[in-house]
């Protein structure tokens, strides 16, 4: 998904020019941040807001300091959206290594109690991109065992896949798609 129109606003995806091919660890995040900040500075005059394209909210603080437009992170946006209409939500992400960071972010914004289940599908980002059916199978296999009122896919590659396929529930559990959460929050800030 390279661009999309949401109402009268236009959403465009810009890729960094260098850095890791996918973000699957803290080390990948650290290597990607300088490239993200550089990209935001380069395009600041062209856009009214930026959405971090990785679910981890990588580089959000650094990017906010570097530009004057709003910078929205999918973790916080999706946690906030889920908390608005449910008392408990779960997060299903790509691997177990990233779970502590999401737990910490939920605590930072006061939603740790509502984030009742954190799980990993153990699916590399590259698999989501190159073999989406296999990735969806792995996601569903874990989701079916989760006991939550709503579920957040904790990877933007999953979010794009769900958007492209019109998926709004998995295993009978409603999905809060971080892609849509971040877009709507960004829109509300630039009206």
Task: Please report, for each region that a protein language model flagged, where it lies by residue.
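A structural micro-motif
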Residues: 8-9, 69, 87, 113-116, ...
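General beta-strand structural signal in soluble alpha/beta enzymes
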Residues: 13-14, 52, 71-74, 152-153, ...
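N-terminal active-site wall of soluble small-molecule enzyme domains
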Residues: 20-39, 53-63
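Hydrophobic alpha-helical
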Residues: 49-52, 56-60, 142-171, 182-186
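Glycine-rich, highly charged phosphate/nucleotide-binding loops
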Residues: 25-45, 132-142
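N-terminal glycine-rich anion-binding loop in soluble enzyme alpha/beta folds
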Residues: 1-34, 93-132
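Conserved beta-strand elements of the Class I
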Residues: 89-92, 152
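Short, acidic/small-residue loops that bind anionic groups at enzyme active sites
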Residues: 64-85, 167-186
